[in-house]
């Protein structure tokens, strides 16, 4: 990490359909090889499926899914006197959001539905209802932090 300058945060333009900055970040994470139009069609297609299946506002389902997947606490390795401890630390807001987005997309990609649109919509609906692989990942992270609570005094 550079000691001189911290990188400037880039301004992210809200998506054209819903006007949401977090949704743009999500689309950018879905995107492969700079193909943003493909990523947009995947996300908007998944939102159309959510709207028809759940009869709910897809943005609200998306936000609920992100909230249910975002971890509050995680473990970080800390070396103390030759031993490495897994120290539980709180997760800052930006990292919470980034992890939630990353885990949702990984979980969607590992599903067995036919298209990415179907996989993403199914994972978002599951996450909004506190089910699915992404929510399990968050619970595993919390369980790991709880198991290592004894080392919380090593926080930095």
UniProtKB/Swiss-Prot annotation:
Mitochondrion found in the keyword field: no
GO cellular component: small ribosomal subunit
Gene3D superfamilies xrefs: Ribosomal protein S7 domain (1.10.455.10)
Keywords assigned by UniProt, alphabetized: Ribonucleoprotein, Ribosomal protein, RNA-binding, rRNA-binding, tRNA-binding
Family matches, as InterPro entries: Ribosomal_uS7, Ribosomal_uS7_bac/org-type, Ribosomal_uS7_CS, Ribosomal_uS7_dom, Ribosomal_uS7_dom_sf
Molecular function in Gene Ontology: rRNA binding; structural constituent of ribosome; tRNA binding
Record GO biological process: translation
SUPFAM superfamilies referenced in this protein's UniProt entry, alphabetically: Ribosomal protein S7
PANTHER family per the UniProt record, alphabetical: RIBOSOMAL PROTEIN S7 (PTHR11205)
Family: Belongs to the universal ribosomal protein uS7 family.
Assembly mode: Part of the 30S ribosomal subunit. Contacts proteins S9 and S11.
Physiological role: One of the primary rRNA binding proteins, it binds directly to 16S rRNA where it nucleates assembly of the head domain of the 30S subunit. Is located at the subunit interface close to the decoding center, probably blocks exit of the E-site tRNA.
This protein's name: Small ribosomal subunit protein uS7
Source organism per UniProt: Methylobacterium sp. (strain 4-46)
